[in-house]
């Protein structure tokens, strides 16, 4: 629907409300979905009219639309259910349970079971979580507070919660103006015309006696005006524009070349004053009406119904954008200037953005293409992704050529979508990627867009067609709009004559538009109509400029730097396209492009001269500065969180400084104290079920900016809102007597999770139609997580793929659905060269390309490169002797491979030129492990000599070597295969030997180790980090699997072989996992390759989705290892 049609609906709503057609008003609100009347919604809820509540809501959202909507409907139906129980109306309660609440069972079966169990209680308040449930009225009011917060946070209600302000009886006024205009065109205008209908145009009848009509009387232009409508005002917005000029007020003044079409030809024939620009304040406040004819008010028509509804009222003044700005009560003390956190990303940070809902979650992008997500409250990096092309086959040839020429890539911009469910990343070469974000730190690949030729310089999210879109701009001088979820292109805007540097989408009066700036300093504006730019203005400095609105969308600012280093921070008068205010304080020539941000509709901040500078928006002089305790670059990047309580600033040496004001410090202290209290809670709480309130997701965290994700209990705050079944006022805190538990008591009462039968997990044996079986010596997931690749001791590969089905629509790997064993139609096998040797005695090795298209593998013979789709051998190289024993791709160049050899050397091989660039010597036995750290710029190797070596990537010289330490219960020098894998933080190393698991730092110092004992006494056969870096999975030679805490190496769960090996396949302990593979996206799923050739996928049950619980901490301290979900260095094990 066009914006004018939408505004017409608002006029009709106002008219219906003034005429007291209340039911019709709310019906139109629901059917049009333009305005959600919160007052009407509150009345329905407080009156318990649940059917009407859901009926009204249905016009705006459905249960399955998003997690906010799901939570809204859940709370309503839950309250209806509890009220039925409170009335002891069991039949009605059962009906609600089956018809209304059953839908939520598919999202959380445990929740549904617990709600069902309330039927068995005489009084549901006997349930501990509902013990504070009061009477019906108070419960409804408490729930209503929660619902209002959910509705305000729900993106589907964007721009629908406020009614636009305009004069009362606006529709009558427009009709009166139209009648006056029609009367002016009468050939024989009468002094007191009689308007009897609106169905046809007015025309005075000719005089019957041939006399001319008397001259017109000077009467009022409009009739009596009723009282103001009951709709709440939305804020400073312009009124409905006269039909003569439909251009939006917010952008009209910039549109020097705009030619709006006139919908009625008769209007163009009128006096010039009728078609003047709509941004003229006098015209807005005093619309001109022809005065050559007497005024007509259609209320004078012969309509008894209308006359009955007439009432004298008071005129009100029109408010319009940019007229004035309300006074702000904030002071300089509200600025975040105190350094409270120092984080290190590991590489230079190029972009920052705080989560729009979770105030302490920070997204960062770096100069090596990495993105990371930090929980600044706990100082933990909860997610990490290194750059990779997800599907190289779908990329354009220019992109493939660019990556082949230079694999280095940087993040130019990363940011969150408005509701924080999606994040977007723009790279310095062609690509934009979007991820779906889950608050437990999980990132799921969503869309990969080959967006521009050259770099993608900026991105932004918008809702041009009620669906989330992502706007991109690039070096190819284009601006494009894409569907954020599918990556489908929607619009292309061209007109810039230089690379486009930044984009700034916005909306005013339901008109959506985009500002863009190019590196030649040109500012342009675009509507979503592909009719070209509406603006062509010059930015101060004529070079790199970014634009941003204040949080309330009423003030527009830009900040830029010229080629000479002169920086400019200005406020624009957006209705006139002129600079309104220029801020002082840039005294020296900037050494980089100055970045800026706004907060609280009051303050501006920019990074310049090695400090952060602050301004009051209404004062051109600098307000204050902070050097953040030193260590800032010349032009630091910075970003406020939504509330303005925290400020993230980039620092030297890959650092990020977090600054806070009083509110921010209080927020972080609360997070710390609650995390501490949670760690000291009563031991009996460890095995209790989580509160029902958040089991549908993390929606409830919109209740407070201090809420954290409930899906990560190790970082969650104690719930202060109602647990599950009855929401409480978040301002109330439970009256709980603290209990101090002795640490030794915790250790004594904690119990290891020991899974001994298949009923406590999900396990699936991969189907295998091959006639022969051999040991699985290598196993790995593809990078997208939808396939498993195994290499047997007979040199033959096997590939399993999960297919998309009705039951598994996403085609994700899971133990719930059997995958297909993949093989080309011609039946070809993917078999390694064996060079007439015995592959059973050879050391096999395998490595997968980042795009999952090719696999490199060897089994004692030549190294073969296979096409994963056709199984064809693309090439072979490195004929033995010596044979290759380990393969690892260089993190920055896929054409360079580190190859561990049987003769103890490491060869750095360039595939493109078929040449060994370097040969590294330092081991005395064959190489059994290689791992790269891009951030540390090093390669770590391990060998059958139980030695670790660190090598510099730059010159390939050896930096250090060390033999792994022998456990206390083992004498003599260690020998045997040793594996290495870098943690996601790129600084800690997991070292795996049959005698131990050990964590080393980058200096090859052993930080801690664990040796087989007690519950897991057998030698270790394999081990690997989980994809989020929080767990370590280890296989043992007796068939058991151990799940360890990655940071402390404490055992949290033991999985007996009887739990995942079918009884028919068991062979008395002789079968064991030779290799363990971790899923790249699901941290609690693993695959194990067995000594009998079988492959099993193992994961916990949905009802208990984690492997046991974390063991209690002792009084010792350990170096912290950050958690990050991206498996940046997935080892070949």
From Swiss-Prot:
Expression across tissues: Expressed in stems and panicles. Detected in roots, seeds, leaves and sheath. Expressed in the meristem and lateral organ primordia.
Phenotype of gene-disrupted mutants: Semi-dwarf, with reduced male fertility and shorter panicles with arrested branches and abnormal spikelets.
First and last residues of every WD repeat: 344-384, 451-492, 495-536, 539-582, 586-625, 630-669, 771-810, 838-876, 879-919, 922-961, 970-1011, 1015-1054
InterPro entries, A to Z: CTLH_C, LisH, Topless_fam, Topless_Znf, TPL_SMU1_LisH-like, TPR1-like_2nd, WD40/YVTN_repeat-like_dom_sf, WD40_repeat_CS
Domain CTLH: 34-92
Keywords, in A-Z order: Nucleus, Repeat, Transcription, Transcription regulation, WD repeat
PROSITE patterns: CTLH, LISH, WD_REPEATS_1, WD_REPEATS_2, WD_REPEATS_REGION
Disulfide bonds: none
Broad class of where this protein is predominantly found: nucleus
Residue ranges the record marks as coiled coil: none
Localization per Swiss-Prot or TrEMBL: Nucleus
Residue ranges occupied by any LisH domain in the UniProt entry: 4-36
BP term (GO), one: inflorescence development
Keyword NADP: no
Gene3D superfamilies the record matches: YVTN repeat-like/Quinoprotein amine dehydrogenase
Written domain comment of the UniProt record: The N-terminal TOPLESS domain (TPD) (1-210) binds directly to a 12-amino acid LxLxL EAR motif peptide.
Stated role: Transcriptional corepressor involved in branch formation regulation, presumably by suppressing primary branch formation and promoting secondary branch formation. Required for the cell elongation in the first internode and pollen development. Probable downstream regulator of strigolactones signaling important in axillary meristem maintenance. Acts in auxin signaling and is associated with the regulation of histone deacetylation. Essential for the function of miR172 microRNA and its target genes in regulating panicle development.
Self-association state and partner proteins as the record states: Tetramer. Interacts with D53, probably via the EAR motifs. Binds to AP2-1/TOE1, AP2-3/SNB and AP2-2/IDS1. Interacts with WOX1. Interacts with MOF1.
Identification of the protein by name: Protein TOPLESS-RELATED PROTEIN 2
Source organism (scientific name): Oryza sativa subsp. japonica (Rice)
Gene that this polypeptide is encoded by: TPR2
């Amino acid at each position: 629907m066009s914006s004018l049609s939408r505004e017409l609906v608002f006029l009709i709503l106002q008219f219906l409300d003034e005429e007291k057609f209340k039911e019709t008003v709310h019906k139109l609100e629901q059917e049009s979905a333009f305005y959600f009347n919160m007052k009407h919604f509150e009345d329905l809820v407080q009156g318990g009219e649940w059917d009407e509540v859901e009926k009204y809501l249905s016009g705006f959202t459905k249960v399955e639309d998003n997690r906010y909507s799901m939570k809204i409907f859940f709370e309503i139906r839950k309250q209806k259910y509890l009220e039925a129980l409170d009335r002891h109306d069991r039949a009605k309660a059962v009906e609600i349970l089956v018809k209304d609440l059953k839908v939520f069972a598919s999202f959380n079966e445990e929740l549904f079971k617990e709600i069902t169990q309330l039927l068995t209680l005489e009084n549901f308040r006997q349930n501990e979580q509902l013990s504070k449930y009061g009477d019906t009225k108070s419960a409804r009011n408490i729930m209503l507070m929660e619902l209002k917060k959910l509705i305000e946070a729900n993106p589907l209600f964007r721009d629908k919660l406020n009614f636009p302000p305009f004069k009362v009886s606006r529709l009558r006024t427009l009709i009166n103006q139209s009648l006056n205009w029609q009367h002016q065109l009468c050939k024989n205008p009468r002094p007191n015309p009689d308007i009897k209908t609106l169905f046809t145009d007015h025309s005075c009848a000719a005089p019957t006696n041939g006399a001319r009509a008397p001259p017109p009387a000077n009467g009022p232009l409009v009739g009596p005006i009723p009282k103001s409508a009951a709709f709440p005002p939305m804020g400073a917005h312009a009124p409905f524009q006269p039909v003569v000029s439909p251009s939006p007020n917010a952008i009209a003044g910039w549109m020097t070349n705009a030619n709006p079409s006139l919908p009625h030809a008769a209007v163009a024939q009128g006096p010039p004053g009728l078609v003047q620009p709509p941004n003229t304040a006098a015209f807005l406040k005093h619309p001109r009406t022809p005065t050559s004819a007497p005024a007509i008010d259609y209320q004078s028509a012969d309509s008894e119904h209308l006359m009955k509804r007439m009432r004298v009222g008071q005129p009100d003044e029109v408010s319009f954008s940019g007229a004035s700005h309300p006074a702000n009560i904030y002071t300089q003390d509200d600025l975040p200037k105190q350094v409270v956190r120092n984080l290190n990303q590991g590489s230079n940070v190029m972009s920052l953005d705080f989560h729009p809902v979770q105030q302490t979650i920070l997204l960062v992008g770096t100069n090596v293409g990495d993105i990371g997500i930090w929980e600044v409250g706990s100082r933990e990096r909860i997610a990490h992704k290194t750059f990779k092309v997800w599907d190289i086959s779908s990329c354009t040839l220019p992109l493939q050529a660019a990556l082949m020429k230079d694999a280095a890539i940087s993040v130019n911009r990363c940011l969150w979508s408005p509701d924080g469910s999606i994040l977007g990343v723009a790279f310095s070469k062609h690509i934009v990627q979007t991820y779906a974000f889950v608050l437990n730190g999980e990132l799921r690949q969503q869309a990969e867009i080959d967006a521009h030729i050259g770099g993608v310089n900026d991105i932004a999210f918008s809702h041009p067609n009620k669906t989330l879109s992502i706007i991109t701009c690039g070096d190819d001088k284009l601006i494009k709009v894409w569907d954020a979820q599918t990556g489908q292109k929607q619009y292309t805007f061209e007109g810039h004559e230089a690379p486009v540097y930044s984009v700034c989408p916005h909306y005013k009066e339901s008109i959506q538009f985009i500002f863009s700036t190019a590196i030649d300093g040109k500012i342009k504006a675009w509507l979503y109509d592909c009719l070209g730019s509406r603006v062509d203005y010059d930015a101060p400095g004529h070079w790199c400029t970014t634009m941003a609105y204040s949080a309330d969308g009423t003030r527009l600012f830009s900040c830029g730097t010229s080629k000479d280093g002169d920086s400019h921070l200005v406020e624009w008068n957006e209705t006139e396209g002129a600079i309104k205010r220029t801020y002082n304080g840039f005294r020296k020539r900037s050494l980089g492009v100055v970045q800026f941000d706004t907060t609280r509709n009051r303050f501006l901040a920019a990074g310049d001269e090695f400090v952060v500078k602050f301004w009051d928006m209404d004062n051109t002089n600098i307000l204050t500065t902070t050097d953040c305790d030193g260590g800032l670059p010349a032009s630091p990047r910075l970003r406020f969180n939504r509330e303005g309580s925290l400020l993230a600033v980039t620092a030297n040496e890959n650092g990020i400084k977090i600054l806070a004001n009083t509110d921010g410090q209080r927020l972080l202290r609360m997070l710390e104290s609650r995390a501490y209290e949670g760690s000291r809670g009563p031991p009996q709480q460890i095995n209790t079920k989580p509160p029902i309130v958040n089991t549908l997701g993390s929606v409830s965290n919109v209740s407070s900016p201090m809420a954290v994700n409930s899906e990560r209990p190790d970082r969650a705050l104690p719930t202060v809102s109602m647990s599950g079944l009855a929401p409480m006022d978040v301002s109330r805190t439970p009256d709980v007597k603290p209990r101090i538990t002795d640490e030794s008591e915790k250790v004594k009462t904690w119990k290891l999770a020991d899974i001994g039968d298949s009923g406590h997990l999900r396990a699936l044996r991969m189907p295998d139609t091959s006639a022969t079986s051999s040991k699985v010596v290598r196993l790995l997931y593809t990078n997208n997580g939808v396939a498993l690749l195994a290499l047997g001791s007979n040199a033959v590969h096997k590939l399993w793929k999960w297919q998309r089905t009705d039951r598994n629509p996403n085609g994700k790997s899971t133990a719930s659905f059997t995958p297909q064993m993949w093989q080309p139609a011609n039946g070809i096998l993917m078999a390694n060269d064996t060079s007439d040797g015995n592959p059973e005695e050879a050391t096999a090795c395998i490595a997968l390309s980042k795009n999952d298209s090719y696999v490199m593998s060897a089994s004692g013979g030549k190294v073969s490169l296979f096409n994963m789709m056709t199984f064809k051998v693309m090439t072979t190289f490195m004929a033995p002797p010596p044979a290759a024993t380990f393969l690892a791709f260089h993190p920055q160049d896929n054409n360079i491979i580190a190859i561990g050899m049987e003769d103890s050397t490491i060869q750095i091989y360039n595939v493109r030129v078929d040449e060994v660039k370097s040969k590294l010597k330092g081991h005395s036995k064959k190489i059994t492990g290689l791992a790269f750290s891009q951030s540390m710029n090093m390669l770590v190797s391990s060998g059958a000599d139980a030695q670790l070596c660190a090598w510099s990537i730059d010159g390939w010289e050896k930096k250090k070597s060390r033999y792994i330490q022998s456990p206390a219960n083992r004498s003599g020098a260690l020998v045997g295969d040793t594996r290495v894998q870098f943690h996601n933080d790129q600084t800690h190393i997991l070292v795996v030997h049959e005698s131990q698991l050990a964590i080393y730092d980058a200096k090859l110092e052993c930080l801690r180790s664990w040796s087989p004992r007690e519950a897991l006494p057998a030698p270790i056969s394999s081990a690997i980090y989980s994809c989020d870096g929080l767990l370590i999975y280890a296989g043992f030679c007796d068939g058991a699997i151990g799940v360890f805490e990655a940071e402390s190496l404490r055992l949290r769960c033991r999985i007996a072989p009887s739990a995942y090996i079918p009884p028919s396949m068991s062979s008395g302990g002789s079968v064991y996992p030779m290799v363990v593979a971790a899923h790249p996206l699901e941290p609690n799923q693993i695959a194990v390759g067995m000594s009998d050739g079988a492959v099993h996928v193992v994961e916990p049950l949905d009802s208990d989705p984690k492997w046991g619980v974390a063991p209690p901490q002792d009084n010792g301290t350990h170096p912290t290892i950050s958690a990050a979900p991206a498996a940046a260095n997935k080892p070949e094990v």
